[in-house]
Structure formats: structure tokens, C-alpha cells
């Protein structure tokens, strides 16, 4: 006879996990999901196993709004090994070419400048983008290269940190869809020596505060602490969560009176004062400003529901 399945928790919110090196984003997600005993969770914007840093984990209804984090800008610290090119553009791959490092400081500065601003980038074959329904890295592992179109990205800031020996350290603030491994590989080719990533840390996602990041070790320590104090682990874990609407924090807020919000929550567009002329909005209700979903201003100036929060019974 099978054991009864433990009932998970319907929790909502976003945890800013500091992903450890050597672990896939999905493995990290599953570990956090078990620690929180959550029924539903997903991550936004996968990090390579080699990479560390901010990985937002969305619980429950927050998963509905995770797309807004995928669309947000990000900041990274990266260290490149010069003189070696690998098949994956990072240290997890095989070295495919070695060349001497002979560029000058002036040549480096000029090369870096070509990556600032609006540029186009051809994604790496070792990425999760799909071609004919199959992920690119699945083709790459079979030794197959498929055509990829260049995609527009924006490098808002590219800071030179240091160049010592065959190591180059940079900090990069970039738009969604930017592959740091590809930037380093392309930079290595511009410098004529080849390069690959040996260290990568995501410092920030959108406007999330870096001081709210937590490690798996800290989460486990809180669970142990709760057991010692004979209290539910949720009492120590849940205060770490950011609000479920935080992925959409860049959008303006429209507050509806309770008399209007009931229609909005039933799927109907409503009129209200103080709404912007167009675009997406975060919708709250009542005096306490409870978040109830995302809306969009329609052609008649009404707030039309786009994504609604489902309220589960306690």
C-alpha cells in the first residue's frame, strides 16, 4: 500500500535564491520547493550550473507574473580566461582552440566599446532556445549546428574591472535575452585570442534588493532552528518572501474600489479614475491595496483583466 502523499502548502511570493555553483537551476528550484513544502513553484531566467547568484523562485500565484521578470534587465560579474576557446564558451566545455594573448590596453578598450549600447547577438548553440521544437543544446550535444538568427539586445553598462595575466574581469548590466558566455566568446574573437567564462555571478534581477538573497544553507538552518524551537518552519521561512506582485513592480498601480473590483475579478473591464492612458497596470483593491492581478488599459480607457490572482480557501 502506497504512503499517503503529504499535502503541500499553497503559498504565494518570490524567494531570491543565491544559487550555488555546480547546481542546475532546476535542481535548486526543487530543493527550495521541498524546503518550503510548496505545491507550486518555478524559477525565472535559468542560470548555468557554473554560475552563482540571484535566481528568483516564484511560489503559487506569483508564477503567473514571472514573465515580467524574464523581460527585465540583469547585472552580472564575469571573469574570462583569455587565450582559450571552448565549445560551450565556458569552463564546463572542451577546449577547441588556444592562441597567444597579444592585444594592448588600447585594443581592449576599443573592443569593449563595440559591445556597449544596442547590439545584435547570435545565441550560443549551448542554450535552451528552441529550433523546430528542440532545444539548441540538444543539437549541440549531437554535434549538429543549426542556423540561429541574431537577436537585438542592449548592454546598458559594461565596466572594466581588471586584466591580470590571462584573466579579464567585467561587470555587465544588460537587457533580457543576453548571453554572457556569447559576449565573452565574441570579445575573445575581436581580441584575436579567444576567451571563455570561468566565473559568472548574477548580481541583480530587475530592482530586487541584493541584500534579500538567501542561500540554501541558510534555508536549511532555519528549518533546523524551527525544529529546535518546536514551531512550524513556515514561521521562519515565509518572512523571506517578496510580494507576489514584485515581478511586475515596474508597472504603475491602479487601485479599484471594492464595488468595482468584484467585476474586474469576474473578468470584466471596469472604469476608474487615475488610470494611465495605455499599457499594463498592477491592479489592487480597497483601502489596504491588496493585489488582485494585472490589467491593461483597453481602447475605451477601461482597465481590462489580463492575469488574475486565484484565492484558495484556507
Curated annotation (Swiss-Prot):
Substrate binds at residues 43, 76, 179, 200. GO terms for biological process: mRNA pseudouridine synthesis; tRNA pseudouridine synthesis. The active site is at residue 48. Keywords: Isomerase, tRNA processing. Gene3D superfamilies: Pseudouridine synthase, PUA domain. GO terms for molecular function: RNA binding; tRNA pseudouridine(55) synthase activity. It comes from the Bacteria. It holds the Pfam family TruB-C_2. InterPro entries: PsdUridine_synth_cat_dom_sf, PsdUridine_synth_N, PUA-like_sf, PUA_sf, tRNA_psdUridine_synth_TruB, tRNA_sdUridine_synth_fam1_C, TruB_C. Its EC number is 5.4.99.25. This is tRNA pseudouridine synthase B. It comes from Shigella boydii serotype 4 (strain Sb227).
Amino acid at each position: 500500500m502506497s504512503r499517503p502523499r503529504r499535502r503541500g502548502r499553497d503559498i504565494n511570493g518570490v524567494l531570491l535564491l543565491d544559487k550555488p555553483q555546480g547546481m542546475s537551476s532546476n535542481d535548486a528550484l526543487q530543493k527550495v520547493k521541498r524546503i518550503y513544502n510548496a505545491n507550486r513553484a518555478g524559477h525565472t531566467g535559468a542560470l548555468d550550473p557554473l554560475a552563482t547568484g540571484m535566481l528568483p523562485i516564484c511560489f503559487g500565484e506569483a508564477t503567473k507574473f514571472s514573465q515580467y521578470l524574464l523581460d527585465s534587465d540583469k547585472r552580472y560579474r564575469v571573469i574570462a580566461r583569455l587565450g582559450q576557446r571552448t565549445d560551450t564558451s565556458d569552463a564546463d566545455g572542451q577546449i577547441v582552440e588556444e592562441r597567444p594573448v597579444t592585444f594592448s590596453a588600447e585594443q581592449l578598450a576599443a573592443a569593449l566599446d563595440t559591445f556597449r549600447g544596442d547590439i545584435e547577438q547570435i545565441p550560443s548553440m549551448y542554450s535552451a532556445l528552441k529550433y523546430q521544437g528542440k532545444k539548441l543544446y540538444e543539437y549541440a550535444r549531437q554535434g549538429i549546428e543549426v542556423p540561429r538568427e541574431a537577436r537585438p539586445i542592449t548592454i546598458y553598462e559594461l565596466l572594466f574591472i581588471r586584466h591580470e595575466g590571462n584573466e579579464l574581469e567585467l561587470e555587465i548590466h544588460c537587457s533580457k535575452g543576453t548571453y554572457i558566455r556569447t559576449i565573452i566568446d565574441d570579445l575573445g574573437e575581436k581580441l584575436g585570442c579567444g576567451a571563455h567564462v570561468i566565473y559568472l555571478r548574477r548580481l541583480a534581477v530587475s530592482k530586487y534588493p541584493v541584500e534579500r538573497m538567501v542561500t540554501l544553507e541558510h534555508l536549511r538552518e532555519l528549518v533546523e532552528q524551527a525544529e529546535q524551537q518546536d514551531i512550524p518552519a513556515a514561521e521562519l521561512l515565509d518572512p523571506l518572501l517578496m510580494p507576489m506582485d514584485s515581478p511586475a513592480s515596474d508597472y504603475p498601480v491602479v487601485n479599484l474600489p471594492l464595488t468595482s473590483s468584484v467585476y474586474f475579478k469576474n473578468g470584466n473591464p471596469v472604469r476608474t479614475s487615475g488610470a494611465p492612458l495605455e499599457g499594463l497596470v498592477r491592479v489592487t483593491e480597497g483601502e489596504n491595496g491588496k493585489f488582485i492581478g494585472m490589467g491593461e488599459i483597453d481602447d475605451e480607457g477601461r482597465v481590462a483583466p489580463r492575469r488574475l490572482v486565484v484565492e484558495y480557501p484556507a
